[in-house]
Amino acid sequence: MNAEFRAENKWVAAWLLEKNERKADIAARREEILRSPSVGMPKIPSRSGKVSDPTGVAAAKLAELQVEERWIALIEEVEKRLPDKQRIFLELRREAGNLQCDIRGRPAWVPYVQYKYPLVMAERTGKKVAEFYMSHPNTYTAWWNRIIEYTARVAAKRGLFG
């Protein structure tokens, strides 16, 4: 069961990090499907004797996109529910992406966010940078894990896994 939860959390983390790219990709694929010249064409018998239904094929492709669109909607809803501090954290976490190297035993995104977070918060609030500096990096990993867990629970309630 732990392996299943870890796999789901990894899936959720990817959706959280890549939401903007995936949303653009989904929109492009939807547009491609809808602009396909075969949509709306009559059914055409093929050489094998099977009937091709271009509109049906397009509908099936659009149905596949609906699952991905439900994930995007979920991620956007979760973002809206987050407190401002965590929403800004998530923006920075996305910016950092999946920096792969470890810096003193921590994933590379942690020091990146630890550096940028107080700067962004100070800029947005007009307060001093020092007011937002968190010396303990575990705060950021705890926020990240909490966002992942919350998103995974909501996704499970909506039947988005398997």
Name each model-derived stretch.
Residues 73, 80, 84-88, 138, ...:
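Generic detection of well-ordered alpha-helical segments
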Residues 118-123, 127-157:
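DNA-recognition helix of helix-turn-helix
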Residues 1-81, 155-162:
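N-terminal interaction/assembly modules
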Residues 81-121:
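Short amphipathic alpha helix immediately N-terminal
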Residues 75, 110, 126:
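Generic structural marker for isolated residues within well-ordered, non-membrane alpha-helices
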